[in-house]
């Protein structure tokens, strides 16, 4: 997932994971609201609702995400969404060997990001959908 400081919302491609996970309607999807994409594309990207994903990174850190679902090419995590969930997001300019990360202000949960091809990515495994979405992670 690309960590995007310019994204207004976190969004995932509709066909990224087809495991029976439900897509929940949102006010925006019900109203047919679309989002302006970055770049030269002029057509709005329609909000199709949201899904919940439970994630585990390579360090064993668990979290969850509720991205909007849309006709996008790759998953984006908005820095603003991380901030709204209580994470401070750090992209160090010094000590280039220090990874970028997001640290939760209440419980110190830390999500570590990799810099690849000039962008920051959060490398995770998506946990299989079990039909039970009650588990809540920071």
What annotation goes with each model-predicted range?
Residues 1-32, 68-71, 78:
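Aspartyl protease active-site motif detector
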Residues 54-138:
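Aspartic protease core domain of the pepsin/retropepsin superfamily
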Residues 9, 27-50, 75, 111-114, ...:
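Pepsin-like aspartyl protease folds
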Residues 1, 41-43, 79, 89:
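Beta-strand elements of modular eukaryotic interaction domains
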Residues 11-13, 44, 83:
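Basic, gly/Ser/Thr/Pro-rich low-complexity segments located predominantly at protein N termini
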């Amino acid at each position: 997932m690309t960590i995007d400081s310019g994204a207004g919302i976190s969004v995932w491609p509709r066909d990224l994971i087809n495991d029976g996970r439900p897509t929940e309607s949102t006010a925006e999807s019900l109203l047919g609201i679309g989002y302006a994409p970055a770049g030269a594309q002029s057509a709005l990207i329609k909000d199709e609702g949201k899904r919940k994903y439970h994630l585990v990174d390579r360090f064993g850190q668990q979290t969850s995400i509720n991205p909007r679902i849309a006709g996008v090419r790759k998953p984006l995590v908005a820095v603003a969404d991380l901030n709204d969930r209580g994470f401070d997001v750090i992209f160090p300019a010094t000590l280039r060997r220090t990874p970028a990360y997001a640290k939760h202000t209440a419980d110190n949960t830390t999500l570590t990001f990799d810099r690849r091809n000039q962008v920051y990515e959060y490398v995770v495994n998506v946990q299989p959908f079990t039909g039970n979405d009650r588990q809540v992670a920071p």
